[in-house]
Amino acid sequence: RRQRQMCIRDSLTALRDDKNEKDFPDLKNEDTARQWIYTSPTAFCNTTDKKILSQVLNNYDQETTDFYRWSVVYSQSELAHLIHEKSGIDFGEIIDLKPIERGTSGRLVRLQIQGSKQTLIIGKELEIRRVLSPSHLYSSAFVVEREDIQNGIPQRFVIHGAGWGHGVGLCQIGAAVMGEQGYPYREILLHYFVGANIEKLY
């Protein structure tokens, strides 16, 4: 699924990244988003084909072969230190990471960090990805599982995520898969940029 952005946020339209661009779930709904993230629906970008991935990924990215669904695990101390380091805010022990708002592609645009010292809502998606990773999470389309809870404090957090990037426009992996399947370039571009006109200017 992707979001397309024209000039303002209200113009975003969600479409599936597969042959059937209709009948997709409302990923702004938390229960629906959670179910979608935990499954692996058919999509052009759902591939682990190393040949295709090598066409669009840098060498260091090729260590990962599944960008469609992924997981990251943090201990309590790792997550608390990371969030403190990246945000500059001491939340104390991290009690929960609560989804507040999702966009049409299921990506979180507002996330509540609940700590033993304070609670704060952060956003948008790029800031969420930055705060929860030493570099960046693959995307902000994720759900969080709290594990080994002792006296109300989780000792481990598992982030289950979907996709790679901000979810707007052309998906490089999906476009490469479409090309490998024989789709002409015009059809690939119009799949990702619905309503666009392709004209020769020379």
Where are the regions that the model predicts?
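Conserved, single-site charged/polar hotspot
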Residues: 1-5, 9-202
